[in-house]
Swiss-Prot record:
Entry keyword Transferase: yes
Gene designation per UniProt: btrB
InterPro entries assigned: Aminotrans_3, Aminotrans_3_PPA_site, PyrdxlP-dep_Trfase, PyrdxlP-dep_Trfase_major, PyrdxlP-dep_Trfase_small
Entry-linked Pfam families: Aminotran_3 (PF00202)
Protein name as it appears in the record: Neamine transaminase BtrB
Length: 432
């Protein structure tokens, strides 16, 4: 990293109070700052180029600075149509589109700026509607302190939230222990480590106990299909949905969708920038492009091709590295030193990866980009194959995969039976 980038990073650290969640240059230990992005590529202030698999942690679904989205935004602004004082027609267009995609009867939509805010709003609405306090949760719902787990397993935190970690048996225990006290069960679906049968069991248990269910589709919604990803694996529907990352190609927007009765509890959820239209327009253009260009099918095929090539590459290297998933995928390592070296070398080769978490593809990752991707990954394995030749032939264990999956889904996976899951939970969270 050259002097200009280092200087910019130091300036950023001196003025921002929040954690800077961007890749680190392994030599200077400085955060990378980007000057621009185009399609699958990012560029730093010194001209270095990278292929981005972090993709704004999954919110860049078309590619950076998509020409269609940028043109729509420019045209809107040049016509002086941005009015924050009150609503404009595009907000109706987007709400009607999301309502239609949800297929919920009498649905209404409320908009927010982040997935964190929308998940919190869903909890508030469910509590106000039901008159109950307890919330049962699985998965990541944002940085809000309400989701922190501070006590023993299946004990509510100070905000009344209990984690069940995608384990149906724990969900059943929690619902039985807190009968008639549960306002909502909220979970973030996963399609890499959780089976369709597990998610159907979770929904079935909720229905048997008569509790409201919210599908936190911030990450998965509008990524695999129009609307909720849950319908990929079950005909069961949730009572509430939260969408965000798949909507707008990186612009700040999220929403809660539910029935008219439940959404009436969100009527006071307004804020200064509620009627800002640029995120709305970006969403409309993104959804139109994904649908008209068969974007969901293309990204799915890109994911299958890329992960297939990566699996072959790692087999050839004989190193303990696995690839799990497809258009959203995770790398799993059989050795901690190898993992650290892999991410370090990946950055050197111009790959932006979400370390320890999920990598995500965008619509612009066509054949040419994938050839470049595999070339860069091959450079990584070429370097590491010699450096870690003592690991050749070693395999990734099921427990290693379970622990790595935990970092991605914030919960237990189907890789181990219930009894073994509980033993690992005791180690991972201090359960009981």
């Amino acid at each position: 990293m050259k002097q200009e980038t280092v200087k910019s990073s130091e300036q950023l650290l001196s003025v921002l109070g929040t954690y800077i969640d961007s890749p680190v240059d392994p030599f200077r230990k400085e955060r990378v700052m980007f000057s621009r992005g185009s399609g699958a590529y990012l560029f730093d202030y010194d001209g270095g180029n990278y292929i981005d698999l972090m993709n704004g942690k999954g919110s860049i679904i078309l590619g950076h600075n998509d020409p269609s989205v940028n043109a729509a935004l420019r045209n809107f602004l040049e016509q002086d149509r941005e009015v924050v004082t009150g609503p404009s027609k595009p907000i109706i267009d987007l709400a009607e589109r999301i309502k239609k995609d949800s297929a919920l009867p009498d649905a209404k939509v409320s908009f927010y700026t982040t997935g964190t805010a929308a998940c919190r709003a869903a909890v508030y609405a469910a509590r106000d509607y039901s008159g109950k306090k307890i919330v049962l949760s699985s998965g990541y719902h944002g940085w809000d302190p309400m989701w922190r787990q501070q006590g023993p397993l299946l004990e509510p935190n100070e905000d009344g939230v209990i984690e069940f970690y995608f384990i149906p048996e724990l969900l059943e225990r929690a619902l039985t222990a807190h009968k008639d006290q549960v306002a909502l069960v909220i979970f973030s679906p996963d399609y890499t480590y959780l089976s369709a049968s597990t998610m159907e069991r979770i929904l079935g248990i909720c229905r048997a106990h008569g509790v409201l269910v919210c599908c936190d589709d911030v990450k998965q919604g509008y990524r695999h299909r129009q609307g909720s990803s849950l319908e990929l694996v079950t005909t069961e529907k949730a009572d509430m949905y939260v969408f965000s990352k798949g909507l707008s190609n990186g612009h700040r927007i999220s929403c809660v969708v539910s029935s008219d009765e439940i959404m009436a509890e969100t009527k006071e959820h307004t804020y200064t920038a509620y009627y800002q239209m640029l995120p709305i327009l970006s969403s409309l253009e993104t959804l139109k492009k994904m649908e008209s260009g068969k974007g969901y099918d293309l990204i799915r095929s890109y994911g299958q091709t890329l992960t297939g090539n990566l699996k072959e590459l790692f087999v050839q290297s004989s190193l303990p590295i696995e690839v799990n998933g497809s258009s959203i995928f995770q790398l799993v390592f059989g050795d901690e030193e190898l993992e650290e070296a892999f991410y370090r070398e990946a950055f050197i080769q111009g790959l932006i990866l979400f370390e320890g978490d999920n990598q995500s593809l965008s619509l612009c990752m066509d054949k040419d980009v994938q050839v470049d991707l595999i070339r860069r990954f091959a450079n990584v394995t070429d370097v590491l194959s010699e450096q870690f030749k003592h690991l050749r032939g070693k395999e990734v264990t099921t427990e290693q995969t379970f622990r790595t999956a935990w970092n991605m889904i914030d919960g237990a996976s189907d890789l181990l039976p219930y009894e073994k899951q509980l033993k690992l939970l005791d180690n991972l969270i201090g359960g009981g």
